[in-house]
Amino acid sequence: MNTTIRILLSFCFLNLVGAALAQPDSIVLRDINWDKNAPAGMNELFIPSSGATIAGLIYRANGVQKHPTLIILHGYPGNERNLDIAQVVRAHGWNVIYFDYRGSWGSGGQFSFANCVQDVVNVAAFCKKYTDSLRVDTSNIVLFGHSMGGWVCLKSLAQLPGIKKGFALSTWDIYGDFKDVKTEQQMMERARQGGNYFVLNTPLQELFKPVVDHPSFYKIQNDTTALASKQIIMLDEHHGNSELADTLRRSNRNYFNYEVWQTDYPFTNKRISLINKVLAFLDK
């Protein structure tokens, strides 16, 4: 084979590889070459949160330096944990922290939607306190939440001035689902539609009564001022959050992206596209 043909074939091959890498529905992963002094790994975390202890874990990135860190917030009750995202993000050079809110999946304390938000604030404080041992770069922490975790992501992002980015996936608009409820019977009928989970230690009546009694706290639109300077992605599989997204977009002075994909609630057929969107957001 002469030199000209070799060069031409090499050029074609590189173009094909480049095109494949550019596709949003493909991803290239490589095994991690362990740093002998600080290899990538995983550790359990026991995090104090308002007098209780919540269980979590950290996927440690490779290397002795402090790493940017993604905090993953699960939904209600949290069957989809998005740990496939965690593995790829860790390989991308980031730490990833996953935890179970108070009163969920064996964590101590009482489960409530408001407590979930405060738990994120407490996890961020934990990262700051143990920044050296956890090797967390506290200047670059990003929140990612799914369903209820999307709501928690936006609510806690509004309370954490040091965290600049949030990715809300299929956000549960808790306020929107209960704003027209007039009686306790209506509230319980609506609450039961979401299931009654033994992995959450709060009865439905106690869990949802604050939503009806104090709706302003649960209304994300009331946090537009605090969220105006943040970088936010909202990604849905339905159009139910379009009004909320429009409100946040109009007030945002930094970066706001809202998309609706043709998929299901856990984004089953779009995992690679989702991971690529997360990575691009982390790198932004």
Question: What does each model-identified segment do?
Answer:
Residues 134-147:
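Alpha/beta-hydrolase fold nucleophile elbow
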Residues 24-25, 158-206:
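Hydrolase active-site cap/lid region
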Residues 75-88:
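The serine-hydrolase catalytic nucleophile loop
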Residues 111-134:
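Alpha/beta-hydrolase active-site loop
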Residues 205-278, 283:
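Serine-hydrolase catalytic core
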Residues 89-108:
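Conserved alpha/beta-hydrolase
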Residues 23-64:
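N-terminal cap/lid segment of alpha/beta-hydrolase-fold proteins
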Residues 66-75:
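Short beta-strand element of the alpha/beta-hydrolase
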